[in-house]
Amino acid sequence: MNRDLEMSPNRLVAYLGKPCKAFTKADIVRYIKENGIQMVNFMYPAGDGRLKTLNFVINNAAYLDAILTCGERVDGSSLFPFIEAGSSDLYVLPRFSTAFLDPFAEIPTLSMLCSYFNKDGFPLESSPENTLRKACRAFNDVTGMEFQAMGELEYYVIAPDAELFPATDQKGYHESAPYAKFNEFRTQCMAYIAQAGGEIKYGHSEV
C-alpha cells in the first residue's frame, strides 16, 4: 500500500488503500459489509444553502446496490424555490468519492454527498455544483486561467471569561494555550473534518 494513503486520516482511504477519487461502488459495498455499517445517508445542498439528508437502513445487499446505483427520487419543489410542483421530480445520486464515516452518528453510518439529476437522467443545470462548474468554465474562457479556491472556517466560542491567563483582544493571532482558549475544541473539529475527507492546511487561533 502507498504509505501516504496508509497514513491518511480519512478512514475509508486508509482502509481501502486508494485515494477517494478512485472509490467505486464495489469499494463502498465492501467497506459497509466489512465494517458493520448499518445506515447510509445521502446529503445534498438545497436552495436555502442548508445540507439536506436522506437516511437509509441497509435491509439487504440488493437494496444497498439499488440505492447506490439508482439514487433516490426527491421533490425538487420543496428543495428549490424556482422549481414548480408540476415538474419537481429530481433524483439524487451519491458521489462515491465523498463517502465518509459519520463521526456523530450513534448508529454506524456511512454518508455521501449527492448530485442532482432531472427526470430524464441529465445533471440538473441549476444545481449548486453545476452553477459553480459553469462559472469556472466561463472564468477560464474569458481569462485563460483556472479557478482554484480554498475554504476558511471561522467561528466564535461564547463562554465565561477565564480568570487565569485572560485573552487579550486583538492579540490572539496564532496564540497558544493557556492564553488561547478551547484549543482542544479546534483540534477535535480538525480531526473530524480530516476523517471525513477534508484536506486541511492548518488551524490556528484568531485575533
Which residues does each PLM region occupy?
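ATP/Mg2+-dependent ligation/transfer catalytic cores
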Residues: 1-205
